[in-house]
Each structure stands twice: as C-alpha cells, then as structure tokens.
Amino acid sequence: MQLEKMITEGSNAASAEIDRVSTLEMCRIINDEDKTVPLAVERVLPDIAAAIDVIHAQVSGGGRLIYIGAGTSGRLGILDASECPPTYGVKPGLVVGLIAGGEYAIQHAVEGAEDSREGGVNDLKNIGLTAQDVVVGIAASGRTPYVIAGLEYARQLGCRTVGISCNPGSAVSTTAEFAITPVVGAEVVTGSSRMKAGTAQKLVLNMLSTGLMIKSGKVFGNLMVDVVATNEKLHVRQVNIVKNATGCNAEKAEAALIACERNCKTAIVMVLKNLDAAEAKKRLDQHGGFIRQVLDKE
C-alpha cells in the first residue's frame, strides 16, 4: 500500500487552518477529532471480542500475549504489558511488549529500526516464541516491516496472530489471522499517527488485556482482586476492594488481608465463607482462582 493512499496519511479538512486559530479553537479542533475515535473502535468491537477469546484460550493453555510494534505503537504495547503485573498480579513474562530498536527506542527514535524485518523476527526468537503464544502486531499504518515480518514468523510457528492498524486492507491486517482495524481518518496534523490512531490503539489494547484478565478470574464484579500492593495507595485500595466485595468494615478487611499475606481473593473468600486463610486459599485453588465459582458452587 502506497503511503500517500493511506487514510492515516490523508489531509484533514477540519484542521487545514489550525495554525491560524486561537489556542482555545486549536484545542476544540483536536478535541472534536478525538471524539470520533471511540466510535471507530465501537465499529470493530466484534473483532476485538474474537481476539480476546483467542488470547484467553491460548493463555489458559500456557501461552503468552506478545505485543510487537515500532515507535508509538511499540511504546503502547510496552505500556499495556507493564501494567498487567501490578494491576492483576500476573507474572511479568505473561504479557510482553516488544519495540523495534529495543529498550533504547522506548524514549528515543531509532533510525531504521521499524524497517528491519530481521529485527522483528529476531526479537520474537529472543523471547523464545512458541506456538502457544499469541502475537499482536501493532502498526497504525499497517505497513511496518518489523511488525509484518514478526507476524509472518509467528504464523510459521503456528501462533495465533492479531493485527491492529488504522488502514483497511493493510499488510498487517492481511498477514494476521485476526484483523482489528479502527478507521479513525486523517490526523489533525497530517501523518501524526500518535494522535487519533495512537488513541484508538490504546483503547483496543486496554480491551484486549482487560478482557483477558476478566476471563481469567482476575476481576470479581468490577474489582481488581489480584492487585499487588506495591505502595500505600494500593494498600488502601486492597482494603476497599475487600470491603466492597463483602460488605465488611475496614478493620475486618485489613485483618483478613494480614492473615492471608495481602491476597484480596483469599481475604474475600475468608470473609464471605467464614474460613481461615489456608482453607480459603485451598478452595480458590480448587476453582482455578475464580471467586465466583467458589461462591456459586459451595
């Protein structure tokens, strides 16, 4: 696909005079364009749901969720991956973010990195990619060689693959088994795909990882019951989670958390089923960590 024919490279009539307007009007133009992004994502919800189901199936069988991208797309994948361990208590290697150019590229532009097909393949090899893993290629343009080669290699291994781009019919979309293509239109600043396209990608990644965690029993109601208390704010959040899930007071919630080494799931089952920490943990283990199953089946 030629660059000049891509929707993400088009000229946006709404911002054609943005360099001549007031600061407030400038903000209004950008905000009005940003409002269209959730609607674009809404149109591809069935595709996102299908991807979540596949990701969950693979991860449940021992696989990992691997994001691969360049520039903004790569950084968004790393951001999403890095938030999963503290929010949901998963091991750091379960959700992985890869970026063209490596760690240095998180904060700096690395010349030519996104054009390296070899780089995409090697980065996946270096993390020991297996057929059980799911590889999600992220590229606003849908034409990034680093990402396309990574998806091709993943498919050769037998991996399930997902391609996220903002240009219909792009190479990323056609290479991946599942395509998620929120069409956000031309950017306010022509070609600046870190804007609407980047926002759309972030919304999609939010759904992929959150959907995976919900389906994996990491959420009870709408509470993040596997949150790791790495700071004072999260200690307080744990207490509030146990309170909200059980209706108990703060003192009882804190006592239960202390008794089970600050595991919200165990504390919730302790309070709701009137169990000690060991028995509550045992029942959770018997039901794969799903609080709902412990409560519904016992």
From Swiss-Prot:
It is an enzyme of class 4 (lyase). The active site is at 83 (proton donor), 114. Induction: Induced by MurNAc 6-phosphate that releases the repressor MurR from the DNA. Repressed by MurR in the absence of MurNAc 6-phosphate. PROSITE patterns: GCKR, SIS. Residues 55-218 form the SIS domain. One of its GO terms (biological process) is N-acetylmuramic acid catabolic process. Coiled coil: none annotated. Keywords: Carbohydrate metabolism, Lyase. The keyword Magnesium does not apply. Specifically catalyzes the cleavage of the D-lactyl ether substituent of MurNAc 6-phosphate, producing GlcNAc 6-phosphate and D-lactate. Together with AnmK, is also required for the utilization of anhydro-N-acetylmuramic acid (anhMurNAc) either imported from the medium or derived from its own cell wall murein, and thus plays a role in cell wall recycling. Homodimer. HAMAP family: MurQ (MF_00068). Belongs to the GCKR-like family. MurNAc-6-P etherase subfamily. This is N-acetylmuramic acid 6-phosphate etherase. It comes from Escherichia fergusonii (strain ATCC 35469 / DSM 13698 / CCUG 18766 / IAM 14443 / JCM 21226 / LMG 7866 / NBRC 102419 / NCTC 12128 / CDC 0568-73).
